[in-house]
Amino acid sequence: MSNGTRDVKEVGLSRRNLLKLTAAGLLGGAAITLFPHLRPAHSAATATDSTKVLVIYYSYTGNTRSIAEMIREKTGGDVFEIETVKEYPADRPGTTKEAKRELETSELPALKKSPPDMSSYDLIFVGSPVWWYTVSTPVMRFLTQADFAGKRVSAFCTHEGGVGKFFPHFKEQAKNAVVLDGLELYKPRQAEEGEVNKALDLWLSKLRAEKIEMKGVQ
């Protein structure tokens, strides 16, 4: 990669790319680019119906946290924040270097809390920044500890330089999960809030449709 720092930090969204938000189809490996300003918005109230939702996330700068909170507001779900025992450097180059070391040595960071009890949830979201074109190491550590036990799981990520192998790596590491379509958000902090809302509503509506289809084959 040409610049590790760009992939560790979570940043905003450029007007030049006007909300380059992508829903990545994990089951079939396809990617669908969403331009929410060209699509009708969907009601958040119809996104999950009575589905009980849990939103799990790790955030370095606050970008992923802001998206997690938006998902919580739209779904009425519970939130669980992944926190590391150690503190990463405040400067992004320092965190870039540490993340690279963790990936190269497989020394994933210790977490403050064990995974929550997920047995009562119908749909679980897991959010992460993209670090070195893959899942951030704190979320990797969480995935080594979590057993989704057949739960429906959807990942979302924030980045400014490409997702790389984020989604296939997430699918490989999410043990016993039924992995649904995920969402990548390119530079979300510079996007207009309405555009991000539309993208999230469209994604949630798609997940709701998948739930109906899954019920139909049971």
Language model: regions and residue ranges:
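A short beta-strand-loop structural module common to alpha/beta enzyme folds
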Residues: 77-89
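C-terminal segment of N-terminal export signals and the immediately downstream linker at the start
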Residues: 34-62, 66-67
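Solvent-exposed loop/turn segments at secondary-structure junctions
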Residues: 60-63, 85-88, 130-134, 159-163, ...
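Helix-loop-strand module that forms the ligand-binding subsite of alpha/beta enzymes
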Residues: 96-178
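Glycine-rich phosphate/pyrophosphate-binding loop and the adjoining helix
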Residues: 185-218
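N-terminal secretory signal peptides
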Residues: 1-13
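Short beta-strand elements in bilobed, periplasmic/extracellular small-molecule ligand-binding domains
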Residues: 79, 178-185
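N-terminal export signals
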Residues: 17-38
